[in-house]
């Protein structure tokens, strides 16, 4: 009897091992699946584990795990539905663009060896964020409420962070610590794969319209304004942005890195930033020309009326370092001249007076013709020169703008959030037109 029981137990044990072996998930061919340190103590072959190969999907470049609460079928979980097909298709599309066009990874990257990782948390309380696992491979941690948008704008943004982190994983770039440029770049990367981003997340554009005067890289604007990066990419090639990350050094901010890579001195950098802002008036970017038509020529600026026909910039939208105002002017008749006299007032009472010995400005006209073309007028600084714009004799104008930018003669890093930014007040006098 005991012998029979022993044999039966042996048979059951062997059967269990065979059944367990049969349930083991075979690893996919192609790129490896990296096992992060915090998962190495977990039995990923066990369906009852929090993370398991039994709740895994993969593409050529990604492995996607979802928590036990979803069950085996993401399209029909107990509560939280995820469109796995759309997620995998969008991930692959974003991946190829970020890698092959923007060049955020290069041949020899660790993402040539490993699939990037996506961890789906079973929660409605969570959000999404991108980064890396163990300094080895880019990763995403997401909750189902962030993958309901069919365009997956949030995922494109966060995958941007994964690719930014991949540069560090690959041993390149000391970068800039917690600089808000990372968020600005992810918004730009999202805009690259979705030209309709401004419309889809119009609240960012609405906010930027009220914050154009803020210093470049100011934390209030980092989610709202990827537009300088669009200009840089147009001017120097899309891969230049990823190269900024590779070339960034400790003790620098993105402006210092950019100037060094582009070979620009401070005056040249200010000239270039002003040119970028002139492009913002009519959104003169060929890649998104069609999509930005509803947003062209929409700026307002708060001025105070002074004596003798002068107008001063109000403190609440006075330009900071590389911040700008776009002042709408009344249209002149064909062939008529508009003259602007400009006077910088660094250190004026009621404004933040910081490094006033470094004060300078850029100002110039931007006119828009009835066929949608931009005319960029001459640019001046605070040398006391007046600027003149002559309206075309042939084409009618639909808009005329005076653009003014704070252009310090020396660059310094943005202050901490609790500290004040330098302001560059000014006044203008307009002849042949008037501010609207």
How would you label these PLM feature ranges?
Residues 54-178, 185-186, 196-199:
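Juxtacatalytic substrate-recognition/specificity segment
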Residues 132-133, 149-154, 169-235, 239-240, ...:
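Acidic/His/Gly-enriched intrinsically disordered linker/tail segments
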Residues 71-88, 238-248, 255-261, 419-424:
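A signal for specific C-terminal beta-sheet/loop modules enriched in small/flexible residues
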Residues 21-89, 93, 97-99, 348, ...:
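Zymogen propeptides/activation segments of proteases
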Residues 38-47, 118-123, 376-382:
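Short, solvent-exposed secondary-structure boundary motifs
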Residues 1-23:
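Bacterial Sec-dependent N-terminal signal peptides
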Residues 252-436:
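Beta/coil-rich, acidic/histidine-enriched accessory regions frequently appended to metallopeptidases
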Residues 6, 60, 114, 336-338, ...:
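Residues at beta-strand starts and edge strands
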């Amino acid at each position: 009897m005991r012998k029979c029981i022993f044999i039966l137990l042996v048979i059951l044990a062997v059967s269990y091992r065979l059944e367990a072996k049969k349930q083991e998930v075979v690893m996919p061919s192609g790129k490896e699946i990296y096992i992060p340190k915090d998962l190495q103590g977990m039995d990923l072959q066990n369906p009852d584990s929090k993370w398991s190969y039994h709740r895994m999907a993969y593409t050529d470049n990604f492995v996607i795990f979802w928590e036990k609460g979803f069950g085996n079928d993401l399209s029909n979980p107990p509560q939280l539905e995820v469109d796995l097909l759309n997620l995998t298709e969008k991930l692959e599309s974003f991946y190829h663009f970020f890698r092959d066009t923007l060049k955020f990874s290069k041949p020899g990257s660790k993402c040539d060896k490993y699939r990037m990782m996506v961890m789906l948390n079973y929660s409605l309380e969570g959000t999404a964020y991108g980064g890396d696992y163990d300094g080895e491979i880019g990763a995403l941690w997401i909750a189902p409420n962030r993958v309901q948008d069919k365009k997956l704008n949030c995922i494109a943004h966060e995958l941007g962070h994964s690719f930014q982190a991949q540069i560090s994983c690959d041993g390149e770039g000391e970068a800039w610590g917690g600089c808000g440029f990372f968020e600005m770049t992810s918004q730009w990367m999202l805009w690259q794969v979705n030209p309709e981003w401004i419309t889809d997340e119009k609240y960012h554009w609405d906010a930027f319209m009220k914050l154009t005067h803020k210093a470049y890289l100011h934390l209030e604007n980092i989610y709202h304004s990827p537009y300088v990066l669009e200009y840089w990419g147009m001017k120097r090639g899309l891969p230049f942005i990823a190269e900024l990350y590779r070339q960034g050094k400790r003790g620098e901010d993105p402006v210092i890195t950019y100037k060094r890579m582009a070979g620009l001195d401070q005056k040249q950098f200010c000239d270039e930033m002003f040119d970028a802002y002139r492009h913002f008036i009519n959104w003169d970017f060929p890649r998104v020309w069609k999509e930005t038509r509803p947003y062209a020529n929409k700026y307002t600026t708060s001025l105070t009326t002074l004596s003798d026909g002068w107008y001063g910039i109000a403190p609440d939208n006075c330009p900071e370092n590389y911040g700008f105002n776009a002042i709408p002017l009344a249209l002149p008749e064909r062939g008529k001249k508009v003259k602007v006299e400009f006077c910088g007032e660094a250190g004026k009472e009621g404004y933040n007076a910081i490094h006033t010995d470094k004060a300078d400005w850029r100002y110039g006209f931007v006119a828009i013709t009835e066929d949608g073309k931009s005319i960029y007028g001459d640019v001046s600084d605070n040398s006391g020169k007046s600027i003149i714009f002559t309206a075309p004799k042939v084409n009618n104008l639909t808009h005329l703008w005076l653009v003014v930018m704070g252009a310090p003669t020396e660059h310094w890093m943005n202050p901490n959030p609790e500290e004040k930014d330098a302001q560059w007040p000014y006044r203008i006098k307009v002849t042949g037109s008037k501010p609207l």
